Amino acid sequence: MQKLQISVYIYLFMLIVAGPVDLNENSEQKENVEKDGLCNACTWGQNSKYSRIEAIKIQILSKLRLGTAPNISEDAIRQLLPKAPPLRELIDQYDVQRDDSSDGSLEDDDYHATTETIITMPTESDFLMQVEGKPKCCFFKFSSKIQYNKVVKAQLWIYLRPVKTPTTVFVQILRLIKPMKDGTRYTGIRSLKLDMNPGTGIWQSIDVKTVLQNWLKQPESNLGIEIKALDENGHDLAVTFPGPGEDGLNPFLEVKVTDTPKRSRRDFGLDCDEHSTESRCCRYPLTVDFEAFGWDWIIAPKRYKANYCSGECEFVFLQKYPHTHLVHQANPRGSAGPCCTPTKMSPINMLYFNGEGQIIYGKIPAMVVDRCGCS
């Protein structure tokens, strides 16, 4: 019995001096276990362009508050897309997402898209159908993006057909009201006089900000408008119901709402390319092509640089995260560890059709990876 006790004491003493030798017998296996535990929570997205693209598709629909991608045919797009100066300017001068992240700033923007410009097309209303003598236009239905944001600009755009001889045109915008006792059903909004020369037709814009603000305060007063543009011979030149060859010449409203200023902070990271041998957390290029997966409802951009993060987050490099390092040292197998994730993201501007056929120019936050880091 005494010899057995002595043997046990000697064995325990050797364990204390030598340490847990069984854990060190295969150092390579231990290293692999620790590396596997570094980023269990986000390994699905590393080194996977496909996962990044699928995530982008989900994010865009979510941030635009769309349950599914709008189903708009190419023919419908040609009919709905106004051939108008403000929209053509957005398309022609569209700044496809720049890869300019040299300043290293990090934007804290909201999750949902911040709308800047909304193009609203006219629709029919029950009131217009009940009016005797069909009014020459237009009822505009306003989305929540207009109703719950501060309107800074509202322009009604109308197209005037070309004339054969020089003439003066008298443009009048009337607001429909409920019939009064004397039979009046219109009240004037704006009127203007302009000179037209022979040649092509022209687009004319009219400020309707005050009217729009009143409509938003009292939605029941929004019964529609009538548009008249009479030349000296009494001919109406305004395109209110487009005929053959007049697709894209419908009247429409261009509404601009406020954008929220963002705060910023500093951050830096590594940039790599597809041929890089860098194993640490790094930003890699990735271009998303909307046409490639059939999203014709996005007018612009047709593609943009999204980028993605990939790489290892070794604890030896984590001076930036001492608390994480200490947790890992205390429990290396129980700690999930830091992940290679975006630390700076920037928005993209997008011109698109929503589910109601409205054309919206908005800013979608956090769609471009500008910096990557371990966190």
From Swiss-Prot:
Entries under Gene3D superfamilies matching the protein: 2.60.120.970, Cystine-knot cytokines
Keyword set, alphabetical order: Cleavage on pair of basic residues, Cytokine, Disulfide bond, Glycoprotein, Growth factor, Heparin-binding, Secreted, Signal
Cystine crosslinks: 272-282, 281-340, 309-372, 313-374
Entry's Gene Ontology molecular function annotations: cytokine activity; growth factor activity; heparin binding; identical protein binding
Database matches in SUPFAM superfamilies: Cystine-knot cytokines (SSF57501)
SMART domains per record: TGFB
InterPro entries given in the database record: Cystine-knot_cytokine, TGF-b_C, TGF-b_propeptide, TGF-beta-rel, TGFb_CS
Signal peptide segment: 1-18
PTM info: Synthesized as large precursor molecule that undergoes proteolytic cleavage to generate an N-terminal propeptide and a disulfide linked C-terminal dimer, which is the biologically active molecule. The circulating form consists of a latent complex of the C-terminal dimer and other proteins, including its propeptide, which maintain the C-terminal dimer in a latent, inactive state. Ligand activation requires additional cleavage of the prodomain by a tolloid-like metalloproteinase.
Role noted for this protein: Acts specifically as a negative regulator of skeletal muscle growth.
Name used for this protein in its record: Growth/differentiation factor 8
